[in-house]
Structure formats: structure tokens, C-alpha cells
Amino acid sequence: MNFDKKNSFFSWINSKIKKNNKKEKKENILLKKEKEGIHTIQNIDNKKIDFLFKLKNSLNKTKQFFGDSISRIFLSKKIDDAFFEELEDTMLLSDIGVHTTDQIISKLINDATHKELKNPEKVYFLLKEHMYSILNRVEKPLKISNHTPFVILVVGINGTGKTTTVSKLAKKYKLAGKSVMLAAADTFRAAGIEQLQILGKRNNIPVISQSSGSDPASVAFDAVKSAISKKIDVLIIDTAGRLHNKLHLLEELKKMVRVIKKLNLSAPHEIMLIIDACNGQNTIKQTEMFHKAINLTGLVITKLDGTAKGGVIFSLANQFLIPIRYIGIGEKTTDLVVFNSNDFIKSIFVK
């Protein structure tokens, strides 16, 4: 073999080796990505399982009172008038409410008759389907739009956990990379102002406040003005707890909305009512009065982990069709979770 041929041969060999090395390297990269993908999916699956376990535990009182009772009724071998009467009684006792219970039972009887269903198990899953459809209509997570600032006005009666919810929301949005500002418009309660100021200091979140007894609308105005000038992403305004039947207090909220609109016509972008699930059917009248006064755009239902009255969520969803943004199932920030109708149904039904 002459010199030129020898060089040509070795060049060809080197070229093949390089190609093989590149191919092997590419395959290794693809294999690594595939493994990482599987690992990521497994992590996501594990997180979902952990979350559902936490949710089921938190809703255990509602499940015991509603889900277990419903399940026992369906052990009956006969679908008749007595069966539906017992089912109706159980739903009423579970705080689902007269209007919503009547609707569900009527639809269930109609569907069971039309489909000639005599099997309790099939009727059970039909009930589950009907109740899921009620919640699914209000499963609309809050999306922070490009409005700067995105203004959230938080309202509710005393003791529902408004300021605590404001704190959790602020932490959530900050962790999501948003710049956040708080407004302490609960000027009737010095402790409420102080609570927000402490939160702001700990989490490096600016808090706009005035002295106790100041006009809440003035605080809201200052906060929106400041948030605009500082180009804040999310402004959350905490308000004083007010009874839904005190019309002059609801007028104050209307005034706050008007004042906010003077600076930003599209704001507030979210008017969020905080509801304590422990109040059961009393929350219906609260929601009605607040909605009538200031046109609510979202609900947060708190303290679901401490009550058997979680059935009220069906009544709220069915009667008002106001999006349920979050539910509270514990004390931690992570226990304020985006509402998911499918997860909720899975957690309160036995099967």
C-alpha cells in the first residue's frame, strides 16, 4: 500500500470512529433525557399522590358525614321512593341546601327512570357525575393578567381568615416570581395592620397602611397609586371584616371600588370573597349580599379541614356560579390550594 493510499485508509478509519463516537454520545444524551423525563414524571405522580392524600385527610370530616352516609344508603338493594327520600335527607344534613338538593334528586330520579337503572352502584356513579358537573362549572383558577398592577380586593365577614389568606396569596405570588404589594385597608383593627406589616417585613413585601381608624378608601387609593408608580405586578388589598347585613359597611366597599377605578378603570381585577366553610348554609346569604353589592369575581373557601359542612360548596357553586379560586385545607401556605373539582369529588366520595 503506497503512502497516499495508507493516509486515505487511516482518514477513513478515523472518520468512522468519530461518527460512531458522535452517534454513541447522541444516544447517551437521549437515554439520559429519557431517564430524566421518567424521573420527572415519577416525581410529578408522587407529588399528586401526596397532595390527594393530604386533601382526603383534610376533607375527612365532610367525607365521614356525607360520603360515608351516602355510601351506606347505596348498600340498599332497591331503588325506590324510600331510597330517594333517605338520600335527600342525608344531602340536606350535609349542608348541600334545599334548592341544590332538590335539583340533584330530581335529575337523579329522572335519569334513573329514563335509563331504567335499578342497580344501586350505577345510580351511585350517576350521583357522583351530577355533583361533579356542579363543581366543574366553577373550577376557574385565578389567572394574573398583564394588568400592572393586578388588583385583588379581598372581602368577607369577621373570622373567615381574610388576613391569613392575604398572607398566603402574597407568599404564593412572590414565589411565582411576581412583585407583590399589600394594602392594610382593615383600618378598624390595629392588629390587622400590624399583622400585614410583620408579614411584609419578613418577606420583603411593601405594605401600604395608615393609622388605625383611617378611611379604608384612602388606603386603597394610596396603594393603587404607589403600585402603579413602582410597576408592581400584584396588589392585594385586605379589608375589614364586615357583617353582610350591615348595609353601611357594604357601602364602604362600594366606595373603595369607585376610588380604585379613578386610578385604573379596569381595577379591581378580582373581588374575592373569603368564606369560612364552618358557617355552612349561612355562607349563602353572605355571598348573596356581597355579590349584590360589589359583584364578586371569585371565592376562597377556608377551614375545610375543620368542618363536616364542606357540602356547602355544592350549594355555593350551584346558586351563584362564581369561580372558586382556592380552598383552604390547613395552616401552611401550601394548604391554600387551587380548587380542582375532580380532586374534591374523589376526596369526599368513598368510591
Swiss-Prot record:
It is an enzyme of class 3 (hydrolase). GO terms for molecular function: ATP hydrolysis activity; GTP binding; GTPase activity; signal recognition particle binding. Its main location: membrane. It is a peripheral membrane protein. Keywords: Cell membrane, Cytoplasm, GTP-binding, Hydrolase, Membrane, Nucleotide-binding, Receptor. Disulfide bonds: none annotated. GTP binds at residues 156-163, 238-242, 302-305. Belongs to the GTP-binding SRP family. FtsY subfamily. This is Signal recognition particle receptor FtsY. It comes from Buchnera aphidicola subsp. Schizaphis graminum (strain Sg). The gene is ftsY.
